[in-house]
């Protein structure tokens, strides 16, 4: 249905379900691990010694990454309308980017004649206790509405 809908409207964006390979797959894996670590850190009751050990491990891998070459080519685009490809990647997006440890990430799909977004917002996205921060909800809605606009071809 997504192909039919996007070809009808000349959309700029459709999801790419091709599994990443190589460095890009490793970047996705690292981002997922950092996301999980952040979520656990937000509400842990671990002892001081355990927290210090975790901090040392994080400092170690941060130093290791700091030694690696910097300035990787951008694998994505800020806006779908300038991507030039209907299967552009958005790995760096703070909302849908699978390569960004800050992203929940929100997964978007075309279902019938509408767009759906699915995400699990962990403790890192909490505003009022037990609730997602309104700014995070707004950012997620911006992505859903952006995809909707992109599918319109306008």
Show where each model-derived region lies:
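Terminal targeting signals and extreme-terminal segments of soluble enzymes
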Residues: 1-154
């Amino acid at each position: 249905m997504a192909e039919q809908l996007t070809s009808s409207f000349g959309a700029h964006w459709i999801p790419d379900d091709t599994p990443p390979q190589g460095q890009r797959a490793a970047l996705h894996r690292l981002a997922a691990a950092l996301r999980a670590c952040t979520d656990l850190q937000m509400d842990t009751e671990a002892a001081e010694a355990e927290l210090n050990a975790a901090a040392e491990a994080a400092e170690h891998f941060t130093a290791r990454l700091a030694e690696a070459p910097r300035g990787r080519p951008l694998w994505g685009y800020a806006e779908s309308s300038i991507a030039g490809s209907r299967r552009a990647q958005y790995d760096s997006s703070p909302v849908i980017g699978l390569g960004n440890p800050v992203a929940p990430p929100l997964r978007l799909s075309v279902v019938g004649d509408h767009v759906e977004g699915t995400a699990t917002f962990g403790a890192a996205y909490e505003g009022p206790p037990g609730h997602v921060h309104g700014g995070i909800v707004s950012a997620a809605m911006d992505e859903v509405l952006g995809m909707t606009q992109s599918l319109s071809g306008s």
